[in-house]
Amino acid sequence: MKEKILIAIAWPYANAELHVGNLTGSHLPGDITARYHRLKGNDVLMVSGTDSHGTPVTLAADKEGKPVEEVYMRYHNGFIELFKNFGITYDLFTTTHTENHFKVSQSIFLALLRNGYMFRQFSKQWYSPAAKRFLPDRYVEGTCYICGFEGARSDQCDNCGNVLEPEKLLNPRAKTGDGELELRETEHFYLDLSKLEPDVKKFLQDRSDHMRDTVLGESLAKIESEGLKPRSITRDLDWGIPVPVEEAGWETKKLYVWFEAVIGYLSAAIEWSQVSAEKDAWRDWWANPKARQFYFIGKDNIFFHCSQWPAQLMGAGSAFMDIFAPSPQPSPEGEGVKLTLPFDIPANQFMNLEGKKISGSRNWAVWGRDALTRYDPDALRYYLTVNMPEAKDSDWDWAEFVARNNNELVATWGNLA
């Protein structure tokens, strides 16, 4: 019997080109899995897209002095060209800046609000009097108050991986040079993850027979030691998805990119259905408890996909369907259709370059587009597959790349074929 298989792959930010670490981390393993299930005769839907919102994208546009729309579309078109040339077989690669994604994301927000999993609260955020605006997330950098890392963002430290409280950041400075900063109060919506913690733990425990320990074990351990805490899901920004609240003051706020970008896995399936023969086909993967969903991401996104994303889906419950796609005959209380939860999250570790961490800012990377101008995609796919960082970080080594292609792909597999 055919299975419904959703291949959901991490959405790259529209602020940099993709390198071999991005490809072997999520796009290539997702493509390999999709090809395998297609060969088995299963119904596969493979989706992803360009993450077009959030401070990484607006900062890139600010740096170039160009409109955000122009910048994100340039990167988006570049991603599509790269995937085509590299043989990544997406059914749909879209963006988060579509009318459909806006509607789906706002419906999830309203469903969580209806079900009592959100609350409003004032908090202190960094404000630039010179620029006359709040500077959220990546617009402010400083020293992490947990591990002492000097390049921490106001919302998260990439060194220790902790979510940060902006007002506790040490030595804060505006990345855009917007003068001195001060703390001011602003109101935001918070997703009350603490209410959903028991459900998230059960979700993970129910998948203990097939999820990697680097994913399952680490996520459960973090929940046990730290718990799930409320997290703000709106921001003071002028670019992104409007908060669906018709009150004065909220027209200047947007949904937080980490809240709405993951909803793209759902909205992309809906968009694919809208351009296919059956507009409700997305339900086969998203309103079907027998469907299996596989999420291919990097290790830096593990905890988020194992905690907040399933929490959003479970918290929205059947209210999402009532809001987004109401049935002419509403289901009895407690019998509404709920969204399908992830089956597996096979996250990969990182690929380094000759022993050093890949860094786009230092131009220490093997860029996908450049590699394809010199080498055949099959040679690149082979090396990235056999050297995939599934259990631990791996390393791109030029000498090994040549040797494994000559000695294995050509001499061994080529002669066998």
Sequence positions of predicted segments:
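Glycine-biased, low-complexity coil/linker segments
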Residues: 331-335
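N-terminal, positively charged nucleic-acid-binding surface of large information/translation enzymes
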Residues: 1-203
